[in-house]
Amino acid sequence: MVKKTYLFLIIILISHSILSEGFVNKAEDYNITDYKSKRVNLVDLNGDYYLDIVLNNKWLLLNDNGKIFELKKDSNLNFNKKRKTVLSVFGDIDNDGDIDCYSGFTARYEDFDKENNKWVYNSKKDKGFRDRILLNDGTGKFRIIKTNISKRYAAPLGAVYLDFDRDGYIDLFQANDYRKYGILYGCYENILWKNINGKNFENINEKVGLETVREYGTSNSSRPSYGAGACDWNNDGKIDILSLSYGRQKNRLWKNNYPEKFTDISEKVYFDGDEIRHGKYPVWVDRGKEKEFRANGNTFSVAPMDYDNDGDIDLFVGEITHAWAGSSSDLSALLINTGKKNGYKFVRIKASDINFPRKRRKRIYKKHGIKLWNNGDLYVSWIDYNRDMLPDLIIGSSDYPDKQRLKIYKQLEDHSFKNVTDKLNINWEGVGGISVGDVDRDGDKDILVGKSFMRLNKKYRKKYLNGIDKNVAGLWINETENDNNWLGIFLRGKGENFSNKFGIGARVKIYTPDGTIQTREIYGGNGHCGQQNPPEILVGLKKNKKVEKVEIFWPNKNNSVQIIKNVKPNQYILIRENEKSVKQIF
């Protein structure tokens, strides 16, 4: 009888262990399903340290102590109902301690004059819509201010904040698309906008070496950019710029040499694309060979992370590719940083080589009997969902009807990955955007995900998606339970002549007794159409009962380093620039 009792208890414990890892979609419980939403942001917009939600660039839902979200009707994010905001990126532009907004609009106001081989402005298309800067009053209510950004039109599909010159104000890198979609080589120039004392912005491309030309196919051509990123790729304390190219063109890594000009070193470090550059299509595709500059990828997103805890920032890039495009069309890939001794060059490992094959709905090309497939990896990010100090990979796929899903790949001890999406109870097809953060402040990260119906017609949705007709967001709450500890960190800089208020560009190292050093950076966006995670740090600590040291490398002109020792786990702390004491927030 005793043996049976013990056996019964063991079965219960094992069952509990199996059920202890997983996510639950609580969008309805949290009151966010009344709004159609493709684009999503998690960001604290009223200064209470709880993450609020922005849906489709226009609805602001304030977080009530991690329990429910309520619409803020007077946010003014949807300031012109006729203007369709393409992306929103949030950061403290004026250093007043609350988070402001860059609101991007895709303006295609030009036509291509084939006879004279030039672009011509079409005033009939211009409705006066431009990009805007909106300042926050601290409660989540925004007002438009006049800046030089609004004096010109462009077609942004990516934007990221960084303080490239470490003057204490965050600058804005704007990644722009085609002047007119379908005209293959006509692209707007990407722009680095320097923040002028929180009141205006200046286009400084010429001053800092970022100017590109309209002529296509050269090393200095403007390229259609569908995303952007920023990180300190080479550990020199300066934030570098990642420009992500569409149309099978090369990506750019702009090395920050401040006070000297930026230089494009993407080819030297193998960030531009993979090694297959023949440009050939499969024999069953009636299409000629592409030139070398058109034999790379369609890169939408990038996720920087020191995933292997070796002190260097690695990258994961999300790509769109198709069976018909051939082997020279880049696949999504992990770019492993090989460090100082190798010139910080990347080793590229295709996603297909580090995880299990994708499950697809089979489609047959009728004429040739060829199985067609698409990879629509528009959004990528990292999440240590089980707090084991090994960041796990999120891939958000969309836009094609062959089972493009939200997927999580668990990082194993040998730094390989395993698809655990089904094990974690996640079921989400058609990703319109992702943002990752701790919504309920319980010490693990949750996932906010938008819904896209791109190429998913009613017939398809009826057959495979239970006939859903409203693209509402999902809020996947992390309900993984284990004994692993954690630590959350908020940074606050002093502002002008010191570090920007939210520490964008800061590097933080977390030292634990087991000898692990986790390296994290605070980012102001990374990816496609405003993809952005909150400017804060949350790390797992495994079974470590304390943090021996937190080391902050502040993004100021003095390159100051601040050290906090002997930090207790399982709390969120606030660290202010050059102040010895820390404050517990949660």
Give, region by region, the residue ranges found by the protein language model:
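N-terminal signal peptide c-region/cleavage motif recognized by signal peptidases
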Residues: 15-17
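Beta-propeller blade repeat segments, especially FG-GAP/WD-type strand-to-loop junctions
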Residues: 20-26, 59-73, 110-145, 183-204, ...
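Repeat-based blade/solenoid architectures
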Residues: 29-41, 77-89, 148-160, 208-228, ...
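Gly/Ser/Thr/Pro-enriched helix-cap/hinge segments flanking short amphipathic alpha-helices
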Residues: 30-32, 422-429, 433, 441-586
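Calcium-coordinating acidic loop motifs
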Residues: 44-46, 50, 64-65, 91-98, ...
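Hydrophobic beta-strand segments that make up the repeating blades of beta-propeller
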Residues: 50-56, 101-105, 172-176, 241-245, ...
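Short consensus segments that form the blades of beta-propeller domains
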Residues: 78-79, 115-126, 180-185, 217-219, ...
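Solenoidal tandem-repeat scaffolds enriched in leucines and small polar residues
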Residues: 144-254, 263-282, 291-304, 320
